[in-house]
């Protein structure tokens, strides 16, 4: 056991975590040269296309150190994006140490700071590594200084390497086996294992990735899942090298998978404890705090026949991504679907793409909204995550919106643009610190301003240099109103929005203009209106397509022409009374792209 090292790699997006992981696998001979490819661990198509890590991946490697001993390295590659911090905290719970990878050109960014604090809070040994040293703009002294100033860990002897060229990677491994402590635990004690991740395989059932704290588990053992109390027979255990490799057993301190033909999707929840059925009194390990979704949106199948398949797909995805929550909902415009909770906009896009690709579904998404707290005049407090469920304005005494504390790290030359953007998004500055060439600003901002397009706008105003980390702080009273969209006088529940009263008229005009472009012309005029309560604040009209009924009249009396035009007008009027307007999918997403 003294030769096992469990560690995670934490870093900001694009600082080279997955490439460093590739080098480790190559140097320790985890895969042959033929099987090696760039970003081996990012196995999902989506991860490769977007160049980001979404799921944490674990690998077990054997490294022969210079002191002649062979060490077993269990390492977990973690995502760097702010929406997937939950994956990171889960991975860290299985480790004794973490490599903090920082790009030697760009320096410390907000996400590395946040993940690093999580690691330090969980009592891990953090080892700084400077990556991308082969780039001409690498400035190791400045970056070491930033690590010490911003994060507060000693970086004087941080290892310099370049994951791309392979320079200094062996030095990283050497330092790692000596810096990161060995796991603690008794091999002879009763089994106690923590489920870090699980996914559903159509042939094998639920596959669980576990970190064994105490004892051992082997094929043929009967294991007990503590939360459900059910007993399962272990079919096989093993590790990823990154290939599935079966082993005789998993012992205390190791990370590997257990397959026990669990067919029920909720049979082995993430964060649960496994033990042997012969020792049911083993205490439950502290799991992970359940994470609360920040953004809610409705997902509806285009064809109502797909509803059951959609439900199954969501169940399987929730097993693999436990931060996703969902409940059934119905909409007048879109039929039956689910209201889903996500950690952020990127998370929502990824889930929607995974549902469409992996489960072959066609989905319509409504505009996302955050959770609001309402105090009614009766004194009761309710929470609302869907604008169409808002009670009448006259019944509400106080409207409270969620406020987040956003920490932004930005080079000094882009500070002005970032401050302007934060003020536009109704932010209130908390403090500002100058750290070398970077500035750290903290703002309190309404969550609905942050989750929609703030990240993209921040990147574009700072030319990609600013980085962001945010967390929920509190609820605060605000002057909010519900903006309804009416098409030909009928409210469309799926298009309702909650906006600040000051922006309502502008948003209303922008939304009706956008809808006018997206709704195809019909045989009759289509009136698109935006309303707050009973007051219409904006209107546009999609003009009718009309046939030239006068084409056949050459000359002749004017009363003949009038008669034909009146007849056409009467026909259009009749059509309008019975006609339905088809709203295309783009119109539901138009709400997202309103430039505030």
Swiss-Prot record:
Domain of life: Bacteria
Primary localization class, coarse: membrane
Annotated Pfam families: EFG_C, GTP_EFTU, GTP_EFTU_D2, LepA_C
Catalytic activities: GTP + H2O = GDP + phosphate + H(+)
CDD domains: EF4_II (cd03699), EF4_III (cd16260), LepA (cd01890), lepA_C (cd03709)
Positions that bind GTP: 14-19, 131-134
Keyword Transmembrane among UniProt keywords: no
GO CC terms of this entry: plasma membrane
EC number: 3.6.5.n1
Localisation: Cell inner membrane
Cross-referenced InterPro entries: EF-4, EFG_III/V, EFG_V-like, EFTu-like_2, LepA_C_sf, LepA_CTD, LepA_IV, P-loop_NTPase
Residue intervals of the tr-type G domain: 2-184
Molecular-function annotations in GO: GTP binding; GTPase activity; guanosine tetraphosphate binding; ribosome binding; translation elongation factor activity
Keywords noted in UniProt: Cell inner membrane, Cell membrane, GTP-binding, Hydrolase, Membrane, Nucleotide-binding, Protein biosynthesis
HAMAP family per the UniProt record, alphabetical: LepA
Function: Required for accurate and efficient protein synthesis under certain stress conditions. May act as a fidelity factor of the translation reaction, by catalyzing a one-codon backward translocation of tRNAs on improperly translocated ribosomes. Back-translocation proceeds from a post-translocation (POST) complex to a pre-translocation (PRE) complex, thus giving elongation factor G a second chance to translocate the tRNAs correctly. Binds to ribosomes in a GTP-dependent manner.
PANTHER family: TRANSLATION FACTOR GUF1 HOMOLOG, CHLOROPLASTIC, TRANSLATION FACTOR GUF1-RELATED
Stated family: Belongs to the TRAFAC class translation factor GTPase superfamily. Classic translation factor GTPase family. LepA subfamily.
Name of the protein in question: Elongation factor 4
Species in which this protein is naturally found: Pseudomonas putida (strain ATCC 700007 / DSM 6899 / JCM 31910 / BCRC 17059 / LMG 24140 / F1)
């Amino acid at each position: 056991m003294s030769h096992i090292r469990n560690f995670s790699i934490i870093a900001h997006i694009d600082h080279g975590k997955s490439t460093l992981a590739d080098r480790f696998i190559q140097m320790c001979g985890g895969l042959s040269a033929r099987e090696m490819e760039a970003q081996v661990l990012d196995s999902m198509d989506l991860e490769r296309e977007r160049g980001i890590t979404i799921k944490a991946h674990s690998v077990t490697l054997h490294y022969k150190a210079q002191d002649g001993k062979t060490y077993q390295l269990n390492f977990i590659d973690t995502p760097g994006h702010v929406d997937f911090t939950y994956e990171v905290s889960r991975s860290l719970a299985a480790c004794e140490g973490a490599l903090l990878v920082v790009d030697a050109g760009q320096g410390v960014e907000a996400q590395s700071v946040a993940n690093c604090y999580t690691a330090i809070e969980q009592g891990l040994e953090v080892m700084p590594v400077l990556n991308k040293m082969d780039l001409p703009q690498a400035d190791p002294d400045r970056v070491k200084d930033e690590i010490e100033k911003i994060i507060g860990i000693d970086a004087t002897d941080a290892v310099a390497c370049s994951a791309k060229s392979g320079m200094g990677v062996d030095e990283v491994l050497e330092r790692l086996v000596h810096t990161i402590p060995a796991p603690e635990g008794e091999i002879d004690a009763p089994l106690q294992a923590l489920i870090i991740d699980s996914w559903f395989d159509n042939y094998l059932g639920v596959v669980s990735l576990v970190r064994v704290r105490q004892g051992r588990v082997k094929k043929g053992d009967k294991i007990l899942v503590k939360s459900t109390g059910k007993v399962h027979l272990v079919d096989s255990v093993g590790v990823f090298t990154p290939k599935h490799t079966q082993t005789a057993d998993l012992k205390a301190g190791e990370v590997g998978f257990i397959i026990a033909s669990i067919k029920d999707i909720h049979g082995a929840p993430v964060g649960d404890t496994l033990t042997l059925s012969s020792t049911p009194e083993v205490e439950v390990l502290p799991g992970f705090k359940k994470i609360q979704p920040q953004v809610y949106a409705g997902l509806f199948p285009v064809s109502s026949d797909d509803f059951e398949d959609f439900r199954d797909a969501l169940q399987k995805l929730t097993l693999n991504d436990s931060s996703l929550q969902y409940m059934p909902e119905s909409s007048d415009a879109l039929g039956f679907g689910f209201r889903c909770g996500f950690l952020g906009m990127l998370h929502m896009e990824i889930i929607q793409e995974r549902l469409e690709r992996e489960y072959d579904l066609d989905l319509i998404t409504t505009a996302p909204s955050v959770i609001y707290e309402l105090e009614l005049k009766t004194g009761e407090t309710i929470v609302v995550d869907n604008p169409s469920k808002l009670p009448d304005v006259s019944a509400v005494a106080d409207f409270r919106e969620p406020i987040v504390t956003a920490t932004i790290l930005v080079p000094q030359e882009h500070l002005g643009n970032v401050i302007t953007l934060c003020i536009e998004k109704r932010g209130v500055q908390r403090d500002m610190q100058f750290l070398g060439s970077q500035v750290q600003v903290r703002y309190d901002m309404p969550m609905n301003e942050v989750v929609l397009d703030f990240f993209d706008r921040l990147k574009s105003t700072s030319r990609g240099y600013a980085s962001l980390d945010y967390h929920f702080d509190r609820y605060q009273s605000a002057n909010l109103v519900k903006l309804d969209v009416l098409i030909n006088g009928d409210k469309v529940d799926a298009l309702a929005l909650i906006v600040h009263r000051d922006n309502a008229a502008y948003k209303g005009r922008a939304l009706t203009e956008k809808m006018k472009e997206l709704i195809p012309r019909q045989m009759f005029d289509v009136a698109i209106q935006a309303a707050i309560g009973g007051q219409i604040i904006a209107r546009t009209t999609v003009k009718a397509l009309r046939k030239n009924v006068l084409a056949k009249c050459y000359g002749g009396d004017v009363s003949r022409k009038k008669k034909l035009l009146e007849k056409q007008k009467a026909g259009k009027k009749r059509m309008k009374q019975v006609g339905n307007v088809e709203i295309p999918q783009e119109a539901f997403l138009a709400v997202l792209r309103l430039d505030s």
